[in-house]
Amino acid sequence: MGKRVQLVLNEDVRKLGYSGDLVEVAPGYARNYLIPKGIAYRATPGVLKQIEHRKAEELKRLEGIKDEAAKQKVALQTIGTFRIEQKAGEEDMLFGRVTSPDVAELIANISGFEIDKRGIDIPDIRKLGTYSVDIKLHPEVIATVKVEVVPE
């Protein structure tokens, strides 16, 4: 295989990489297509330092987000049980069911944390009782809380 050229992508290129990625390509592909179209630029030592600096800042930012999620997890688990009132009929069956938007709204009202309803893993709640609900606050941080469904 011949010599390869290091480039930094300005935009996403299918089967090659995403914007900001450092990639190695054939010199002809770089010279004839990627660079003239403005899709990529040469990776000089100064550019490589900038990329490393940006990655370090991004890593720091992501760690901050993860730490914030861990604090939210502790706060949610300190609250303990979240109580939600629903209309119920015979044999403690609910009229309807408790859904993830209901739980997200309940948590927001009680704790003040805005939780994405798509991050809530909720069992099928159609009866009164206490249920365990997993809340994905971050890809690496999952909080488990109790939701108690009581009659109105």
From Swiss-Prot:
Species of origin: Acaryochloris marina (strain MBIC 11017)
Entry GO CC: ribonucleoprotein complex; ribosome
GO annotation terms (biological process): translation
Cross-referenced InterPro entries: Ribosomal_bL9, Ribosomal_bL9/RNase_H1_N, Ribosomal_bL9_bac/chp, Ribosomal_bL9_C, Ribosomal_bL9_C_sf, Ribosomal_bL9_N, Ribosomal_bL9_N_sf
Annotated GO MF terms: rRNA binding; structural constituent of ribosome
Entry-linked Gene3D superfamilies: Ribosomal protein L9, C-terminal domain (3.10.430.100), Ribosomal protein L9, N-terminal domain (3.40.5.10)
Transmembrane segments: none
Protein name from the UniProt record: Large ribosomal subunit protein bL9
Function: Binds to the 23S rRNA.
Keywords assigned: Ribonucleoprotein, Ribosomal protein, RNA-binding, rRNA-binding
Family: Belongs to the bacterial ribosomal protein bL9 family.
PANTHER family reported in the protein's UniProt record: 50S RIBOSOMAL PROTEIN L9
Pfam families given in the database record: Ribosomal_L9_C, Ribosomal_L9_N
NCBIfam families listed in its UniProt record: L9
The keyword Ribosomal protein is assigned to this record: yes
